[in-house]
Design a protein with these regions (language model features):
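Structural helix-boundary/capping segments
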Residues: 1, 19-50, 58, 99-151
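Short, surface-exposed loop/helix-turn segments at secondary-structure junctions
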Residues: 36, 40, 44, 71-92
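Short glycine-rich anion-binding loops that position phosphate/pyrophosphate groups of nucleotides
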Residues: 29, 67-70
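Glycine-rich phosphate/pyrophosphate-binding loop
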Residues: 1-18
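Short, positively charged
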Residues: 14-17, 87-91, 144-147
C-alpha cells in the first residue's frame, strides 16, 4: 500500500481537484514557512482535542449535524475548478476537526429536506468506536429516517 501512495506524483491526474489543492497548499506552506504554521496548527489541535475530551468526559457521545447546510446539487462535470473547490471545502466545517483530533465519528441519515438526505454525526471518545456504533444501530433499528421531515 505504501508503494502505491509513494507514486502519487506519477498519477496526479487521478487525484481530485480538492485533494490536489490541499496538497499544493501544504507543500507551499512547508516550503515557504519551514513548518512554522504546521507546528502552530499541531499545538491548536492538541488544545482542540483536550476541549472535546473535556466535553466527552461528561457525555457518552456528541450529536451534531454532519454538514453546516442542507444538501446542494453537485457541480456539473464541466464546472469551473473554483466552484468544485468551494463545494468540496464548504462541507468540511463540522467534520474536519475530527480528522485532526482522531475522535471517532460517523454520519447517519436522519431525515429529508427537499427530497435529499440530512445527516447527523455521532462523535465518541477517543478509541470508543463501539459507543457510536451501538447508538447508530439503535437509531437505525428504531427510526424510519426517510419519514422524518425538517421543520
Amino acid at each position: 500500500m505504501l508503494d502505491w501512495h509513494c507514486t502519487w506524483r506519477n498519477r496526479a491526474d487521478e487525484l481530485s481537484d480538492s485533494l490536489k489543492n490541499t496538497m499544493l497548499l501544504g507543500h507551499y506552506m512547508v516550503t515557504r514557512y519551514r513548518g512554522h504554521y504546521y507546528a502552530k496548527a499541531q499545538n491548536l489541535v492538541r488544545r482542540l482535542r483536550r476541549a472535546y475530551d473535556d466535553v466527552l468526559a461528561r457525555y457518552d457521545l456528541l450529536l451534531m449535524p454532519t454538514l453546516p447546510m442542507v444538501a446542494t446539487p453537485l457541480p456539473e462535470p464541466n464546472a469551473p475548478v473554483e466552484q468544485i473547490l468551494q463545494r468540496a471545502f464548504e462541507m468540511l466545517a463540522n467534520t474536519a476537526q475530527f480528522d485532526c483530533t482522531h475522535h471517532p465519528a460517523m454520519s447517519l441519515p436522519c431525515g429529508l429536506v427537499d427530497g435529499l438526505p440530512v445527516g447527523m454525526m455521532l462523535v465518541g471518545k477517543a478509541f470508543d468506536e463501539n459507543t457510536i456504533l451501538r447508538a447508530a444501530a439503535a437509531f437505525e433499528k428504531g427510526v424510519d429516517w426517510k419519514s422524518l421531515k425538517a421543520g
